[in-house]
C-alpha cells in the first residue's frame, strides 16, 4: 500500500459546476480535516505546493460546533490571504458562518461570512484581477462540507 487515495482528503477538483465558478486557472482542493492537527498537516501540504508553484491561497471553510475552530485556523495564519466561511447544511451541529468568521479572525486571518461555497467562488471570480496569478482555493473544515461540495460539483467519490 504505497499509494492510498482518500476521497475528500487533499482531493483536487479539476472540473465540475463549482470549478467553473472560480477565477480562470484556479486550483480547487477539498479537504475534510476538521481539527487543529489536520489543519497543520494540510497547511504543510499547501506550503510544499507553494514552494513549487506559488499562488495566493484562499480558504472556504465550514465547520461543526464540536471542533476547535480557532486552533484549526491558526495553522493557516500567514498563508491564507482570506477566508470565506460557509454554513454546513448537512449537519445540525454546523457553526453559523458569522460565528466561524469570528473564530478565523481570532486566529489572525482576514475572514468574511458568505452563504455558500458557490457564492464564495463567484465573489472571488468577480473581484479577481486577470493580471494576478490564479488562486489556490481550499474548501475545508468538515467532512460534511466536503460531501456537499462533491455532490454540488458533480464529482462524487467513486
Placement of each model-derived feature along the sequence:
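Short, flexible loop segments at boundaries between secondary-structure elements
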Residues: 8, 88-91, 158
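Nucleotide phosphate-binding/pyrophosphate-handling subdomain across enzymes
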Residues: 1-82
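C-terminal helical cap/extension that packs against the catalytic core
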Residues: 25-30, 36, 73-135
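Canonical bilayer-spanning transmembrane alpha-helix
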Residues: 136-140
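Cofactor-binding loop segments of dinucleotide-utilizing enzymes, especially the Rossmann-like FAD-
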Residues: 61-65, 88, 141
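Glycine/aspartate-rich loop-and-adjacent alpha/beta segment that forms the canonical ThDP
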Residues: 142-158
Amino acid at each position: 500500500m504505497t499509494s492510498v487515495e482518500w476521497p475528500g482528503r487533499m482531493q483536487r477538483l479539476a472540473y465540475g459546476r463549482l470549478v467553473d465558478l472560480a477565477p480562470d486557472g484556479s486550483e480547487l482542493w477539498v479537504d475534510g480535516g476538521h481539527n487543529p492537527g489536520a489543519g497543520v498537516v494540510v497547511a504543510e501540504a499547501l506550503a510544499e505546493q507553494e514552494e513549487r508553484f506559488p499562488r495566493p491561497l484562499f480558504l472556504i471553510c465550514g465547520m461543526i460546533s464540536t471542533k476547535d475552530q480557532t486552533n484549526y485556523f491558526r495553522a493557516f495564519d500567514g498563508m491564507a490571504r482570506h477566508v470565506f466561511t460557509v454554513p454546513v447544511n448537512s449537519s445540525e451541529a454546523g457553526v453559523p458562518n458569522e460565528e466561524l468568521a469570528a473564530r478565523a479572525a481570532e486566529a489572525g486571518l482576514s475572514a468574511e461570512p458568505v452563504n455558500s461555497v458557490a457564492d464564495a467562488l463567484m465573489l472571488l471570480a468577480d473581484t479577481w484581477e486577470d493580471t494576478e496569478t490564479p488562486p489556490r482555493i481550499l474548501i475545508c473544515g468538515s467532512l460534511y462540507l466536503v460531501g456537499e461540495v462533491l455532490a454540488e460539483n458533480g464529482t462524487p467519490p467513486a
